[in-house]
Amino acid sequence: MTEQGTSIIQEFDQTPAKVFEAVIDVRGWWSKNITGSTAAPADEFVYDVPDVHHSRIRLVDVVPSQRVVWRVLDNTFSFVQDQAEWTDTEIRFEISAGADGRTVLRFTHVGLVPEFECYDVCHKSWGFYVGHSLRKLITTGTGLPNEITDDVEVIGARMESVAG
């Protein structure tokens, strides 16, 4: 697999342990409509926005306070031709010590490249979920995940309100 992908790097005053706990609390920052487990190696979960996006993801590497790696096992989007664009990509959260005792979180969706039809939407979405919602969960204890009943219009409006 190519090492290319979309990345977001953030720094926090919180400890690596606190950043790690927020990352594995996927319902706290991505979507409350996650089924399955999201914390230990070999856990699998499903992310679903009905009629728009469905992903089944496995945790393939989990090292507390250091890293979490997901592998996308299967994925479908309603808005692209090639339904395999996310399949077999890796989503990495790498936690390390930064300057002045700060914690660095590097998020990379390895394999999500500009050539993909979904790239613009997915890049923007990760910017919201990781750059805003996960950041908020880490810094305040409350993220901005999708609600179980949210449809794509509600989700889009939430993203736009933060971006605007």
List the predicted regions and their residue ranges.
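Glycine-rich portal/gate segments that line the openings of hydrophobic small-molecule binding cavities
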Residues: G28-D82, A163
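Beta-strand/loop substructures that line and gate deep hydrophobic ligand-binding cavities in soluble
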Residues: F79-F128, P145-E147
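Hydrophobic ligand-binding cavity/cleft-lining segments
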Residues: M1-T38, A163-G164
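Intrinsic-disorder/low-complexity, polar/charged segments enriched in Ser/Thr/Lys/Arg/Asp/Glu/Gln
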Residues: E3-I9, E44, H54, R67, ...
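Hydrophobic/aromatic beta-strand elements that line small-molecule binding cavities or substrate pockets
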Residues: I9-Q10, S55-D61, D88-A97
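Short, highly charged C-terminal tails/helix-capping segments
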Residues: K136-G164
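Hydrophobic pocket/interface hotspot
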Residues: V19-V23, L59, W70, L105-F107, ...
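Short, intrinsically disordered, mixed-charge
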Residues: E21-W29, P64, F128-H132, K136-T140
